[in-house]
A protein has these predicted regions:
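Basic/polar phosphate-binding segments, predominantly the helix-turn-helix DNA-binding elements
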Residues: 11, 15-17, 23-59, 79-104
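Short, basic, alpha-helical segments at the C-terminal edge of helix-turn-helix-like DNA-binding modules
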Residues: 56-65, 104-115
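Short amphipathic helical patch at the helix-1/turn junction of helix-turn-helix
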Residues: 20-21, 68-70
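Intrinsically disordered, low-complexity basic tails/linkers immediately adjacent to helix-turn-helix/homeobox/MYB/SANT
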Residues: 77, 81, 112-115
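Inter-domain helical "communication" segments and dimerization helices
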Residues: 1-14, 18-22, 110-115
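Ser/Thr-centric signal marking residues that sit
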Residues: 48, 71, 76
């Protein structure tokens, strides 16, 4: 992969990481990185093995896991804090990624049994 394309993908990944709780517009990210949407999708997947949307989702869920482990907040609050508009959608995606519902996982994380 050419250096300039690699730099553009790094820039896109950094933008998504920094703004993970915001609504993601791949079109806007592509424009800011001076790429077409299709080129961004294609090259982003080569570099990260995820689409830009899946990358954002992974970051959101990891951040939610950290919030649930370290703060005394409920699942719905964690969902909204990381950018989800629906607590039920958040719970489904969280369980899919971590293998258990966020409420159960947060209790385990807070008790120090799992990391």
């Amino acid at each position: 992969m050419q250096g300039s394309v690699s730099n553009k993908i790094s820039k896109a990944a950094a933008k998504i990481k920094n703004e993970f709780s915001q609504k993601l517009s791949v079109k806007d990210v592509a424009r800011e990185c001076d790429m077409s949407e299709s080129s961004l999708y294609h090259n982003f997947k080569i570099v990260t093995s995820l689409s830009p949307i899946a990358f954002q989702k992974k970051i959101r869920l990891e951040e939610a896991k950290n919030l649930l482990a370290t703060k005394k907040i409920g699942v719905a609050q964690a969902a909204f804090d990381v950018g989800y508009e629906s607590a039920s959608q958040f719970s489904r995606e969280y369980a899919r990624m971590f293998g258990m519902p966020p409420k159960v996982h947060s209790e385990i994380l807070r008790s120090g049994v799992a990391s």
